[in-house]
Every structure is written in C-alpha cells, then in structure tokens.
Swiss-Prot record:
Organism name: Arabidopsis thaliana
CDD domains cross-referenced by the UniProt entry: PHD_Bye1p_SIZ1_like, SP-RING_Siz-like
InterPro entries from the UniProt entry: SAP_dom, SAP_dom_sf, SIZ1/2_SP-RING, Zinc_finger_PHD-type_CS, Znf_FYVE_PHD, Znf_MIZ, Znf_PHD, Znf_RING/FYVE/PHD
Descriptive protein name: E3 SUMO-protein ligase SIZ1
Residue segments, region Disordered: 84-103, 753-778, 792-824, 836-869
Lineage: Eukaryota, Viridiplantae, Streptophyta, Embryophyta, Tracheophyta
Cross-link (Glycyl lysine isopeptide (Lys-Gly) (interchain with G-Cter in SUMO)): 100, 488
Biased composition range(s): Basic and acidic residues: 837-847
Residues binding Zn(2+): 379, 381, 402, 405
Domain of life, per lineage: Eukaryota
Keywords of this entry: Flowering, Isopeptide bond, Metal-binding, Nucleus, Plant defense, Stress response, Transferase, Ubl conjugation, Ubl conjugation pathway, Zinc, Zinc-finger
Gene name of this polypeptide: SIZ1
C-alpha cells in the first residue's frame, strides 16, 4: 500500500476535530465540510503544486504530512480518541521542510483561485470566501483595501465574502444565472497633478450566446451591469463611482439616479441598470469610467427576476430561524432593562419602575399593525416589522436594513420572530387600531386597553397570557383552586349564636349554678387551661366578645357548657350577650301596662338629657305570663335521665345540660320541692350560706314550660314556677377560671368595663367582716360564694325583714313566704330588656320594661371607666329602691 492510500485509510477514521488539528499543524484553512477537510490533506500528498498553494508560506513534504497523520491516528488508538494530536504535541517539524523536486502536475479544479485582478496564481497571502457554495481564494492585497492609501494594510475581517457572493445578497430579487463578464477591477488611467479626482476606467468585451439570447426572450430574464466598491462598509449593496459614465456597444446608459459628484451614504443604494436592449448576439463591448480614487469592480451578469413570494420563501419558517426559547430570553432581557447589553453600567428606568412595558406592534415601515412579525437575527433589540411589507418595499429600495437599529444585513438574516408572531396571530381578528400590548418581565402579555368598553371588545386578549399564548390563571381562578382546609368550628351555628349559661336542673327540678371544677374535668376547663385566674361575669353589653363594643364577631364567646337562648323580639337585652339564638321558645312579649305602684328612681350621668323612664307593666300580676319569661314544662317527675353524652355537651347543642355527670357538682344535689310555694321576692344574686332546700325558692303560679330538648332530658311539674337564676359571685380572690354563670372563656374577671355596670361594688372591710361571722353552709358552699341584690319586695310590702336588709335571704324564709311575682317580672324584664331595633335606638325609643334604663354612649376616650362607675351607682339605687 502506497503512502497516499495509507493516509487516506487513516483519515477515514478521523473526526472533524482531528482533521482540523492536522490542518492547524499544516497551516491550512479549517473551514468546510468533513470531506473537504480530508481532500485538503490528501491534496498535499498527491499534488506538490497544490500543497505549495495551500500551505502558503510553509512548504511540507509528503513524508511530513504522512507522519503527522500517522501520529494523530496512533494517539486516537491509545487514548480512545480522548487525547488528540493537537496543541503542538505532534513532533514533526513542518516549518522547515522543503518540497522535493518532482514533476509538476496540472492544477486541480477543486482549488479555485479567482481574483478581481485577473491573476489566478497563488500568492503568499490569500483569503477564502465564507460562502459554502463558493469557497474561492482571492489575493488579500487585491480585495482587502484600506480606507485611505496611506493607512497601511488593514487587518483581515472576521468573515469575508467575494464580490460575487456580495452581489447575490445585495438584491435577492435577482438570481444570477451566468456571468458573461467576470468581475474586473477599475484601474487608474491618469493621475492629475492639481489634486483633481483620479480618473478610472475599464473596457471589456463579453459574449452572449444563442442560448443566452433564448433566455432573454422570456420576460423574467435580463442582462444587468453592476459595480461595487471593494472596501465598502456596507457589504451587500451596489455602488457606482462618482461621475460614472457607462456605455454598452457605444450606447450611453445611465448608471445612477443621484448627482454625479454626490457620494453614496450609508443608507443609500445604487441600482444595476438593465442593458438587455443594448446587447446583441455574439460579442458586446462595455466600458465604464469615473472620477473616483476608490477602487471598484465591475461586471455583467445574466439574471432572472424572482417574485415576491419566492423571496418570502427564502426566509425560514417560524421556529427554524430562531427557537422560541431564544426569542423569549431576548424579550426578557430587553424588558428587564439594558436593551440586551448585560453590563453593569446599564441604567434602565424600565427595570426600576415598570411592572410591565408597553410594546407597539405598528410596523415602522407601513404604520399598520404587524401581521407577520419579522426581524433580523443578529439584532439584540426586540423590535419587529411586518415581514410582508418589509420585503415588498425592499423590492424597489434594495435596502436590507433594520428599520429599528438601522444596521445593514442581508436577506439571509431575516427571520420570523416566534414570540411576537404568536401574539400578532392571536390579534388578527382585532380592529386595526388595536396596536399596543403590555409585556411583563417574565414575558407574559396582554392587549392594552384604555376603557372598559375596549376591554369587553377584546375579550380574552385583555387578560394576561403566558409567553406561549395560553391564558394565565386569573386571581379568581387561583382562589377557586386553593385548597380548602377544614376548619373546626366549636360551639358555632349559622344563625345568631346563643348565650350559654352555666346552670342546670338538679334531680329535684331546681335550677342550679355550676360550681368551679377544681379537678379540671369540665369541658370548659379542658379548653381554657390554667392561664386565667379571674371570674366569668355577665356582660351588660351587646358585644359578643365582652369588649364593650357593639358589632363584635359573633363567632367568639361560644365555648360554654350548655345553651341558654333568649328571644328579645327586636329589643336590646343589655344584660345578655349578642349571642342570642331565636330558635328556642323563650319569647319576650313586653307589653306596656299600667305602672301600678312601682316607682323607679333614675340617676343618669349620661350626656343625653332626654333619658326615658319606662314604668314596669304588670307582667306577672294576676299570675299572667304574657310579659314574663316562659319556660315550657313537661308533667312533674323526672321521666328521662340526664343526657350524659359528653360530645353533646362539648358541642354546645345540649340545651340546658351543663354537666357530664353529677361529679361536676361540688355540693350535694337538693331535693325537688313537693309543692309550689309563693316567692316573697326575686333573688338575682344570693350570698346566703343555706341553700340546702334548693338553690332558690322563688316560683310562679304559671308553669315553667321547657321543652325536653332544652331540659336535656329532664321534665318539671306544671305547677313548678319560675326559679330565680343565681349568678356567680363577684369575688376576685378565687382562682378558678370558670366560676361564672356565663361560661365564656373570653370574658374573665373585670377586664371588660362594660361588665362593671352589672356588678355590685366591692364591699369595704366592715361589710366583709359582717359576712365572716356567718356560718358556712351545710352542703359545703361558703357564704362568700353568693352575692345578693334585692330587686324589690313581696306584694305584702314587707320591707322590714332583716334578711332582706343586708341582702341575705335564707332558704327557710324563701320557702315559706307568700307573695306575688312582681319581682320575678322585674327580673325577667331586666334580663330581657332590649331596644326594639337599631333604628329605634337612634330615636331614643325604649320598650315598656320595668328595669330598662338609658344606656350611655360608648366612646373610646379615657372617660369610659368613670362613666361606667357612675352608671354602677345608678343601677344600685334603682335595684335597691324597690317599690315605695
């Protein structure tokens, strides 16, 4: 096997990287396809003349080339093609090798040398055309020229195109079919001594064959004369010299439309005149002269005209010229600021202040909205133009220049913008006046609108779209898709929340107050823990939270043991929270009646002078129940056992059942009275130590009608009267958290000023010492645990009773005394006194309730505490006055 065949076999295993490494060592060009690189190496082995041409200054022998190929191949075998013969690792010295004397072979046609000077011989410095279909070699000194003759040799450009390739790109509407006259360089004929312009001229002949003449018979074929400045800053355009004089077969032809002495600007373009009418079959003569010192080349070509659609077909389709990801990255970079220059000195106001950026989709060429978004690929901005309009205008102007940045390119750089073209495609059915969109830094967009009517007309286009054109989820959709977390609602109902009182019926049918659970087993204690050390009190406020402010959230103050629901029929119940449920049968039909002998002394400290004093009606006079508090009752006797379901207690839906079992009482249960005694008065608060016979012995002739649902399973005798409801003591020395009538974990102690007005003032030391001498109750309750407020006397007018003087009323006296139920009426009215409505409150209209008193205006200033303290004194006088 000879040397050339051996190297050819080894080169077949080389990759492009290895081939370029070998060519680098040989000093040859590395551009081209793989087969071209292989042929370039094999040429050095087969043809000495071509080797001398390719290697330029260095001459290499066949043996040196073969050794270089062999070393590279051996390294590929050893290292698995990972360590390549590159970066000076080849030890062969190719710089000092000389070509051995061998007979010269004819020049191979693969090595094309075509220069404007007309010389096809190689020189020491040559440059190759970048066009893959051309790859001709030209002399550097002939085509790379300085701007001024005295500037010296300019550096080689990064990319080089020969004059033929530049001409093809200058006007894509003309397709070159043949070159009857190859490019020739104009030469200076005279050099004036007076500094005038140098005259240059060239005269050539070209031949038009019969086949060319047949083509010219078709309307789309023509013969065109062209001229080009070799060192033009705008590569892809024609330019004629100053004072150009063109003649074809002796016929003058106008070459330019500008004045002869005017230079062509950067944005200007010259056209190539059509000389078809001036030529004839056979040999034709053409000459060109001009007064210009610059170097031009001149030629004649046979061309075919392209249609507009054919030129548009040259532009790659959407997504092929540029990927969508690259286009989106450019838009984000431009919207984010900097205009594509990622330098630290970029000072973009858009990046600082704008949430989105307005983009106008009007074509800068036509002024109408862009239909097909086109742009030049090398441009760093995001501006676009209408592709169809742009190409059509360039059919005459031949100015392939970006209308935004004014940089010059060729038709091969035009692409369809994949980002903006999706937007314009969605807007094709919009009105032509809709031309603006808003783009966010992430690339999402929407059509800009100024009025609500425009938004409705745009429809979905007025909403934010993702960069790919899909709709972005709106805030409503996001809210709908949010995960709904389960919320545990304890003691809450959809309607008005009920007031829950810590009372229940014992085995004897007596209503009793829940004692503090010292062992921590009650439901409220399990929820409250041990952070609160003060008592629960009854708020004299319409606030649900005990804060003293009307309209608080009714969802709080719901954690009581049981429910005690009242219906006020539109009247404001100052002594009960807003959490009143109207679903239970506790009507308050406060009707106006004669005042009788009940007289109420009102001391008001409020700012209003028109406080109304409502005289109590005979609610319970004559054993009537219309104005009282009605509890429906079942027949006497305990029919059903008490509901011991702890879940019903904790849930707040067990009616008046307040205790899981009897263990929640610290005192023995009292016996149910066998008959219904008449109550001498109403005991709202009790501090007597003796409650063994019943917590309160106050009854009424009318039945207490409580439904089984409210009683929690207990029933009472029809003749059993309304019993007074004891309230928790006001002592602050106790440490239990739920020692209150109202089992509300949020209203502890005396934190809320609105609660102060319904509590007795704290007794002084002398008053307290009087209570210390009293004996403790036999059932384990201390006398300090109960406080009494006397709300009037019996019908017999017994004001001199010692038990009522100091507010202490024994159970024996209560069980034996006879009287009317006026005090019960007064207490029920006190509990159920509400204003008719919010509108009636504004008009200062009060219900006919015996103990409904004017409320002061609540304010947020520092006088609230003093005002409520004065109101406390007023209430005490009202309650203690009774009936005189």
């Amino acid at each position: 096997m000879d040397l050339e065949a051996n190297c050819k076999e080894k080169l077949s295993y080389f990759r492009i990287k290895e081939l370029k490494d070998v060519l680098t060592q040989l000093g040859l060009s590395k551009q081209g396809k793989k087969q071209e690189l292989v042929d370039r190496i094999l040429t050095l082995l087969s043809d000495e003349q071509a080797a001398r041409l390719l290697s330029k200054k260095n001459t290499v022998a066949k043996e040196a080339v073969a050794k270089l190929v062999d070393d590279t191949y051996r390294k590929m075998q050893v290292s698995g093609a990972s360590d390549l013969a590159s970066k000076g690792q080849v030890s062969s010295d190719t710089s000092n090798l000389k070509v051995k004397g061998e007979p010269e072979d004819p020049f191979q046609p693969e090595i094309k040398v075509r220069c404007v000077c007309g010389n096809s011989l190689e020189t020491d410095s040559m440059i190759q055309c970048e066009d893959p279909r051309c790859h001709v070699w030209q002399h550097v000194g002939c085509v790379i020229l300085p701007d001024k003759p005295m500037d010296g040799n300019p550096p080689l450009p990064e990319s080089f195109y020969c004059e033929i390739c530049r001409l093809t790109r200058a006007d894509p509407f003309w397709v070159t079919v043949a070159h009857p006259l190859s490019p020739v360089r104009l030469t200076a004929t005279t050099i004036p001594n007076d500094g005038a312009s140098t005259m240059q001229s060239v005269e050539r002949t070209f031949q038009i064959t019969r086949a060319d003449k047949d083509l010219l018979a078709k309307p789309e074929y023509d013969v065109q004369a062209w001229c080009m400045l070799l060192n033009d800053k705008v590569l892809f355009r024609m330019q004629w010299p100053q004072y150009a004089d063109l003649q074809v077969n002796g016929v003058p032809v106008r070459a330019i439309n500008r004045p002869g002495g005017q230079l062509l600007g950067v944005n200007g373009r010259d056209d190539g005149p059509i000389i078809t009418s001036c030529i004839r079959d056979g040999v034709n003569r053409i000459s060109l002269s001009g007064g210009d010192v610059r170097i031009f080349c001149f030629g004649v070509r046979l061309v075919k005209r392209r249609t507009l659609q054919q030129v548009l077909n040259l532009i790659p389709e959407e997504g092929k010229g540029e990927t969508f990801e690259d286009a989106l990255a450019r838009v984000r970079r431009c919207i984010g600021g900097g205009g594509g220059d990622d330098n630290a000195d970029s000072d973009s106001d858009i990046e600082v202040v704008a949430d989105f950026f307005g983009v106008n989709l009007r074509c800068p060429m036509s002024g109408s909205r862009i239909k097909v978004a086109g742009r030049f690929l090398p441009c760093v901005h995001m501006g676009c133009f209408d592709l169809d309009v742009f190409v059509e205008l360039n059919q005459r102007s031949r100015k392939w220049q970006c209308p935004i940045c004014l940089k010059n390119y060729s038709v091969e750089h035009v692409i369809v913008d994949p980002y903006f073209n999706r937007i314009t495609s969605k807007m094709k059915h919009c009105d032509e006046e809709v031309t603006e969109i808003e783009v966010k830094p992430d690339g999402s967009w929407r059509v800009k609108f100024k009025r609500e009517s425009e938004r409705r007309e745009l429809g979905e286009l007025s909403q934010w779209h993702a960069p790919d054109g899909s709709l972005c989820p709106s805030a409503v959709d996001i809210k709908r898709k949010m995960e709904m977390l389960p919320v545990k609602q304890e003691g809450y109902s959809d309607g008005p929340a009920p007031l829950k009182l810590g009372i229940r019926k014992n085995r004897n049918g007596i209503w009793e107050v829940s004692k503090p659970n010292t062992n921590g087993l009650s439901s409220s204690n399990r929820q409250e823990k041990v952070g609160y050390q003060e008592k629960n009190i009854i708020p004299m406020s319409s606030s649900a939270t005990g804060s003293g402010r009307d309209g608080d959230d009714a969802s709080v103050n719901q954690d009581a043991i049981g429910t005690f629901d009242f219906v006020a029929n539109g009247m404001e119940l100052d002594s009960i929270s807003m959490n009143v449920d109207s679903g239970y049968n506790f009507p308050d039909r406060n009707q106006s009646g004669e005042g009788g002998n009940n007289e109420v002394i009102v001391l008001s400290d409020s700012d209003d002078e028109n406080d109304l004093v409502i005289t109590p009606g005979p609610a319970y006079s004559g054993c009537q129940t219309d104005g009282g508090l009605t509890f429906p009752l079942n027949p006497p006797g305990i029919i059903n056992s008490y509901n011991e379901d702890p879940h019903s207690i904790a849930g707040g839906s067990s009616g008046l059942g307040l205790f899981n079992d009897d263990d929640e009482f610290d005192t023995p249960l009292w016996s149910f009275p066998s008959e219904t005694p008449e109550a001498p008065g109403f005991q709202l608060f009790r501090s007597d130590a003796d409650v063994s016979g019943g917590l309160v012995g106050l009854h009424h002739h009318s039945p207490l009608n409580c439904s089984p649902e409210i009683n929690g399973g207990y029933t009472m005798a029809p003749e059993t009267s309304m019993a007074s409801v004891p309230v928790v003591p006001g002592s602050t020395g106790r440490s239990e958290a739920n020692d209150g009538l109202v089992d509300n974990p949020l209203a502890f102690g005396r934190d809320d000023p609105s609660l102060q007005i319904f509590l007795p003032t704290k007794p002084d030391a002398s008053a307290q010492s009087g209570f210390k001498n009293q004996a403790d109750m036999s059932n384990g309750l201390r006398s300090e645990d109960w406080i009494s407020l006397r709300l009037g006397d019996s019908a017999s007018g017994n004001h001199g009773d010692p038990a009522t003087t100091n507010g202490i009323n024994s159970s024996h006296q209560m069980s034996t005394r006879e009287g009317s139920m006026d005090t019960t009426t007064e207490t029920a009215s006190l509990l159920l006194g509400m204003n008719d409505s919010r509108q009636d409150k504004a008009k200062k209209q009060r219900s006919d309730n015996p103990f409904s008193f004017p409320r002061q205006k609540r304010s947020n200033n520092e006088q609230d505490h003093q005002t409520r303290h004065r109101s406390l004194n007023k209430i005490c006088i009202i309650l203690c006055a009774g009936k005189n």
